[in-house]
Amino acid sequence: VTTADARCDVLVVGSGGAGMSAAIAAREAGASVIVITKSALGASNTGRAQGGIQAAIGADDTTEDHFEDTLSAGHDDGDPALVRTLVEGGPDAIAWLASIGVPFTHDDGDLRVIRCGGARRPRLLQAGERTGAEMVQALRAAVRASGAEVRESTSLEALEPAGDGWRALTRAKDGSTTPITASVVVLAAGGGLGGEAARIGEKSTNHPDATPEVLEMALALGAEGRDLDSWQRHPTGAVWPAGLAGYALPETTRSYGATLHDAAGERFVDELAPRDVVADAIIRVVEEGRGSAAPDGTMGAWLDTTAIDRDNGPGFTAERLAYVHNRYLKQGVDITKERVLVYPVLHYRNGGLVIDESGRTTLARLYAAGEITGGVHGTNRLMGNSLLDTVVFGRIAGSAAAREALA
């Protein structure tokens, strides 16, 4: 069944942090907006992000330091103009998120910042210990309040140029299809690494909806891509218990003092090195026969989480890492009393669609933001930069798309 055509100024595909930020910005700029999302509004990888969001707001920090850290961690493969846009937009992104209700954590009246891998200074802000989930809650409410039309359980089936815009064919959960004609489209459907992991038989940290068909559709239309085969593995994916397969212990676990050890108990890497350095070191330890085996034979390295309370005092883990602590407790493991086995797990696509500083792809009237894009993170992303990316470039793309649609 095909229902009547719908029309809008801006069609946003995807409803993670980037899609919701884009929709809000486009509405603020006066455009009519339709958001389509495969399941519920906000169901995305954004909501799974535990660690935090980076922004240079500290008195001893600068956007220049953040810029250099981001480029360096990405092996200088990032687009400097995009990296500059990301980091310079950081402080304003935090202020905006706070204004829509994200409850950032404070210590003694100041925003708490901690240091994470690849960063020279404490720069990671948190909203409790599930920053992404708090962001999604605030963004979802802001989208609903903005007047954007949201079509849940609706996927993008096809996209084609139509006059001075685009015609999208969408499919609802009941199988009915609806064409949507839009002056401008913003793609914010993620990198789809969950689907890629399934294809090759690996686990991933991704949301079940994280499949790459929208990225592939844009590439098939002729949009230029970059670094598409650059996939990031989160260093500390849970190996055991089996019920935690695909779960990654957040990098803050290591920021707070957890250390990595081989089977002999020797440390083998700087735990706060960039993600690919730590992940490669764990893989190398296992390949060299220095790893340890879980009861089912799966290999990994030890993450000594017991060091956190030893270094910071009893109760620190239960307070600062309650979500991690409780997930393991439900599986019969107390991470304050025993080490856990970890091994890198597929996490993030570093590359994607080529965009400029306004979020424009190489196709007319087609914008993109978030993990579906490339160039922002080079070939290795810093922890906390993905949430920042969704907000900075989501807002930029939404505003620019609205301006073009209304011109």
Model features per residue range: what roles?
Residues D5-C8, G175-V184, T362-L363:
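Core beta-strand elements of the Rossmann-like FAD/NAD(P) dinucleotide-binding domain
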Residues A55-L86:
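Glycine-rich active-site loop/strand segments that organize a redox cofactor
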Residues E28-Q50:
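Glycine-rich FAD pyrophosphate-binding loop
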Residues L41, M217, A223-D334, A400, ...:
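An anion/pyrophosphate-binding glycine-rich loop and adjacent beta-alpha core
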Residues V10-V35:
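N-terminal Rossmann-like FAD-binding beta1-loop-alpha1 element of flavoenzymes
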Residues G190, R360-L382:
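Short FAD-binding loop at a beta-strand-to-alpha-helix junction that anchors the flavin cofactor
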Residues V184-G243, Y247, L387-A400:
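Glycine-rich loop(s) and the adjacent beta-strand/alpha-helix scaffold that form part
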Residues I100-S176, V184, A188-G192, A197, ...:
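Conserved redox-cofactor binding core of oxidoreductases
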